């Protein structure tokens, strides 16, 4: 049973009724044309329309995507990963997401640099490499915020360990755990990945390669 979702007071979110259907495990990145909506609890109080950076997939590797959102709260930015359909332009870029289409972001909680991300049970429908990609998308997006250093995950309020490329399963992860999943800035497959995106990707890659200590 999911714990009660705390609704962000900064903007209204329409609840979309979905038709019940059989659920199968998701092992491939999905295209961005989805209709799921989500409500989340804000982790930071910054409000006002702004541009945020989400991390999506280009041929299975992580690339940044600038997205205009109503505010720059952590819950809003991560919520867009679970419901990217609000930005129709990104659907034409050929980018994908491994975050399962039917999963919901229940809430987020920031405590001393560690963000706890609570997701609905549908997140468990993604398995294998796609699950690791989905976790990496969330971690890279969350750690765009300077006050977030680490991420923990919960499913229906229960702590879960998540896979990393180098450390195996871990209860707390950082962006350093997913450096190997970043796209090569000089070899992105989508022709519409513009120079600004490549520059942002190169900067984040250089920062992580400098600051991350091999384990």
Positions of predicted regions on the chain:
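Bimodal "functional hotspot" detector
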Residues: 1-215
């Amino acid at each position: 049973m999911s714990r009660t979702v705390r609704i962000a007071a900064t903007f209204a979110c329409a609840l979309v009724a979905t038709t019940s259907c059989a659920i199968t495990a998701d092992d491939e990145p999905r295209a961005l044309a989805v209709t799921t909506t989500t409500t989340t609890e804000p982790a930071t109080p910054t409000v006002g329309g702004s541009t945020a950076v989400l991390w999506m997939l280009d041929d299975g590797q992580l690339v940044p995507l600038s997205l205009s959102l109503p505010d720059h709260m952590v819950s809003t930015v991560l919520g867009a990963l679970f419901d990217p359909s609000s930005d129709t332009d990104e659907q034409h870029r050929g980018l994908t997401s491994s975050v399962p289409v039917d999963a919901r972001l229940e809430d987020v909680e920031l405590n001393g640099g560690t963000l706890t991300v609570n997701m609905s049970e549908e997140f468990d429908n993604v398995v294998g490499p796609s699950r690791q990609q989905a976790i990496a998308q969330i971690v890279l997006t969350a750690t765009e915020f300077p006050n977030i250093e680490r991420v923990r995950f919960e499913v229906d309020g229960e702590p879960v360990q998540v896979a990393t490329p180098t450390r195996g399963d871990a209860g707390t992860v950082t962006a350093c755990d997913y450096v190997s999943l970043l796209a090569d800035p000089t070899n992105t497959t989508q022709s519409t990945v513009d120079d600004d995106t490549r520059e942002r990707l190169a900067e984040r890659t250089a920062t992580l390669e400098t600051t991350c200590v091999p384990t």
